[in-house]
Amino acid sequence: MSSRIGAFMLLIFLFFQILSVSALTNGFDGSALQALKAEWTKPPSNWEGADPCGTSWVGITCSNNRVVSISLGNLNVEGKLSGDIAALSELQILDLSYNTGLTGPLPPNIGELKKLKNLILVGCSFTGQIPQSIGQLEQLIYLSLNLNQFSGTIPASIGRLSKLYWFDIADNQIEGTLPVSNGTSSPGLDMLLETKHFHFGKNKLSGSIPENLFSSNMTLIHVLFDGNQFTGKIPDTLSLVQTLTVLRLDRNKLTGNIPTSLNNLTSLQELYLANNEFTGTLPNLTSLTSLYTLDVSNNTFEPSPIPSWISSLDSLATLRMEGIKLNGSIPNSFFSPAQLQTVILKRNQIDSTLDFGTRFSNQLEFVDLQYNNIDVYKQPSSNTVIQVILADNPVCQEEGNKPNYCSEIPPNTSYSTIPPTCTPCDQGREASPSCRCAHPVIGTLYFRSPSFSGLLNSTNFEILQKSIEDFFKKLSYPVDSVAIRNIRENATDHQLLIDLLVFPLGRESFNESGMSLVNFAFSNQTYKPPHIFGPYVFRANPYNQFSDAGGSSSSNMGIIIGAAVGAVVLLLLLTLAGVYALRQRKRADRATDQNNPFAKWNTSKSSIDAPQLMGAKAFTFEELKKCTENFSEANDVGGGGYGKV
């Protein structure tokens, strides 16, 4: 009996083993994705069935039946991110960027995703405190939470993320001070020795910038603290970070003198100190020979002449010194740096004559000297194209027709890589560079600190367009072409904004799979622009013209495979059942033979047939007495402990 039960249990085990092979998704992972789907009012359209890996759910990547990546950029997903995400124990990438319908706080147990490397939630609508448990994601490399509505403070536990490369929380409502370690049990941002990017701009961070935040062991290249409420002085320890290339401290409430120790940052290319409350005089920064951009506008420096050392900064392209009480005349060599493109000196007390001389940069495009005391302007030769603004200077206060330099002319932002001769498209479509009408991905590239400022030279933008196009083609993305247009500078933070259009390949609109791929290239910073454009963020517009689910063919193939596997399973089960029944029949026959007392009677060697037992027969006492002749001793065959027989 026990052997029959064992065989039956083996059959059940084999059945479930076969079923588990036929489903290509780990059971726990499948349940977790189903729970996520239940939280979303608009999940991807092909998220159907119970086998996300086997039926190729859009945005889901699997390895060995485990979900390792979720990438759903700009797929109009709406709802909340539930704690069920923590069940995906093999997850390495989570990218939900550009889904503005994703709201609510992050789940507190998100730190259970021990293998997570990329957490990318750019441009959603998440709120609340960043969970402390994020500090448990020991494998994390990219942490991009920018362009949301997060509040609260920066978790000190993030200091434990020893592999973190990219840390971006810009454009939120995060407040409080910057956490630093206490040398014993409490972690802090000073422990992030491998991190290259601190992007904290446009928040509500306050207090002083801690002295022990920076050290010579750090490898930071970008420190972007602009648009916060920091107070106090620039810490001298900042100059210990020799790898720094971009420093943005503008639009805070910093005070004191600008430290001369900044001269130690010899790799620095961008220095933004504008719109603070710095005092004293501007220090000599001649050691910053790699500097492209210097912006010290709108501080409370003491009155001083224009620094002569400016002309020694050979790499300087953009100089902004608005409203810092500069006086006297402009030095003859002031415009001589070979890369100089833009000079902003408005709202000062500069007087005398504006004369570019003969040694000015041939890259020079724009000079703004509004609200000064210039009374003479010696214009350069007629073949020189420099836009000069001298409005509200004595030279422009004479009666009569005023020259162009006495008016503020807005910069030309009409540049576009889409030919103006294209026939206008209908139904909300856009013309591609080849004049083909389609529904492109449209968004804006925000370049946070470009190393150039001139908008008149189209070469930089042609290089950018080709760079993006080549990137997509090299990786065989479903992209036909890209276009850029509406180039402008943000007047507040001087970021460079460019509208980007990415056109689908071989169809009128993207499917969901193609959309996910394109957006991940930007959200994950897989695409890297030419060096002169610096750090960037892409913000995609909502997309509502999907051509199909993007995974229907895969789903159909999954159904076909499932049906085929089911048929094989059924056939195998029937075969196993037949084998089992045959073996049971043979066992029954062997048992019958063993219980037959005449089973080995050899009739070939005897003329007498084997006795045929008809069953047990009962005899009465009288019959026994008669047959034994009243129990005569002549019929005695033997004796035993219980009497004679």
Residue ranges and their predicted role:
Residues 1-583, 589-595, 609:
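Plant-biased, solvent-exposed loop and capping regions
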Residues 588-616:
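Cytoplasmic C-terminal tails of single-pass
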